[in-house]
Each structure stands twice: as structure tokens, then as C-alpha cells.
Amino acid sequence: LFFSGIRYGNLRAGFPDKGAYSAQSSLEELKQKNCKLMCFCGIASPDSFVGWVRQSFPEAPALIFPDHHQYKASDLEKIHSAFERLENGNKCIITTQKDHMHLKNNPLFEALTPYIYYIEIDIHFVDGQEDVFNKLITDYVRNHTKNAAMARSQH
């Protein structure tokens, strides 16, 4: 039995060529720049993400969509309206890497691209069991695939 978790990493500008404040940032840096921000996500367990944002920005509005959500024009209008309601000044939108990937080529999202940041995540194993897990998977594949001989020769 293995236990894993998510660690939040850096904030990355979703569209660094569109005028973001910086290509890479942190919530603390955005706080120092006196940014007003909101967040949105469409993930299975949004509480962790929203809680992470609200540790630094307790008043940040959050829009929550269902997991694997296919964003429509009406959803993007909700995001845009929430963004417009933020106080004037430096404004940012924080989302997940998954949601950024869903929206990055959506032309309806174009107006918000200079303000979008997404959070990088890292999956980690509790008690440093990553090597044990990887060996278990590699050994299984090596011994239980049609191409077991090829798998053995590559490792």
C-alpha cells in the first residue's frame, strides 16, 4: 500500500508573452505587488487548491466547476465577470495546470490571458517510497508483458 500527495510548486504565467507580471511567481510575490486575485478550477477535490490560494489571499473569489469540465462561453463569461469585479489595480487569475491546458487555445479566453497564472503540482510518495513503487511497476512490466524480452533488454 502506497500513500501519495500533491505539493504545490511555483506559479507560472499561463501566457508569458501576453504581458504577465512575471513568467514565474509565487503567491507571496503577488501579495507584495498588491495583486487582487481570483481563482477557478474544474478538479475533483477543489478544497485543497482554493485553501492554498486563500492562505495568502483570504478574500479571493473562487469559481468551482466540476471535474473534467468542458468550459463553455457562459463559463468563461462567469470567470470574466468575477475578474472584472476585482478592485482596480494589479489583477491576477490563478488556476490549475489542468484547467490552463483546457483553456489555453480557447479564443474566448483571449482577453484574460495576460492575467492568468497556473500552479505547478508535484506528486510525491509519503515516506519516500517512490523508488519502491517504481521498481514494483518496472518489475511487473518486465515479467508480465508480451514484450517482456524487450523490456528486460532495455533495463
Question: What are these regions, as identified by a protein language model?
Answer:
Residues 1-155:
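ATP-dependent carboxylate-amine ligase
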